[in-house]
């Protein structure tokens, strides 16, 4: 059965290896980082935490090495501690290089964005001028349409006024026709009445004339032929 001290040594070594791999992975992430600067800052914060954990575990392993009873095991563990320290220093150097590479990449990207931003500003200026010209053209077109619609409205009003006048004229003519129709009907009645009266007058004249002739004949008869 392994001694408790050996178990602690094994666990400590495993954690040192784990933190070392995590540091290497974060350093690679920094190499691949193209910005922004806040992303780089976040990665560096994680690297610092892992380095601190790694340093503590190396110190724990060194303390365990010093507590070994056998000199050979002590020296072996101290050699491992030294190797871990060298590896940590190598990781720190790689970390600095990765930061330098990342910062250069970010600077280049920012310069490219500035240049592109100038192009974008020129494009925006051109676009604004084009939009202003288009807006002016659209405004003129709308004003032309508005004038045309106003003319059409005026023509419609004039046509409506003409229709109203024509309708009024027709109504007046209709009233005149009605008045004339009444006058014609009245004239017809008067003519009919006059015709009837004329016939009656003729009949009365004829009767009076007949009566007069009869009277004359009677008088003549009495005078000329008294014996009859």
Swiss-Prot record:
Bilayer topology: Single-pass type IV membrane protein
Question: Per the UniProt record, which residue ranges are transmembrane?
Answer: 200-220
InterPro entries on file: Sec20, Sec20_C
Ranges in coiled-coil conformation:
37-90
Top-level taxon in the UniProt lineage:
Eukaryota
Write out the tissue specificity statement of the associated record. Isoform 1 is highly expressed in heart, brain, liver skeletal muscle and pancreas. Isoform 3 is moderately expressed in placenta, lung and kidney. Isoform 4 is highly expressed in testis and small intestine.
Q: Which GO terms describe its molecular function?
A: calcium-induced calcium release activity; SNAP receptor activity
Q: What family is it from?
A: Belongs to the SEC20 family.
Supply the source organism's classification.
Eukaryota, Metazoa, Chordata, Craniata, Vertebrata
Quaternary organization: Component of a SNARE complex consisting of STX18, USE1L, BNIP1/SEC20L and SEC22B. Interacts directly with STX18, RINT1/TIP20L and NAPA. Interacts with ZW10 through RINT1. Interacts with BCL2. Interacts with RNF186. Interacts with RNF185. Interacts with SQSTM1; increased by 'Lys-63'-linked polyubiquitination of BNIP1.
Gene symbol here is BNIP1
Q: What is this protein called?
A: Vesicle transport protein SEC20
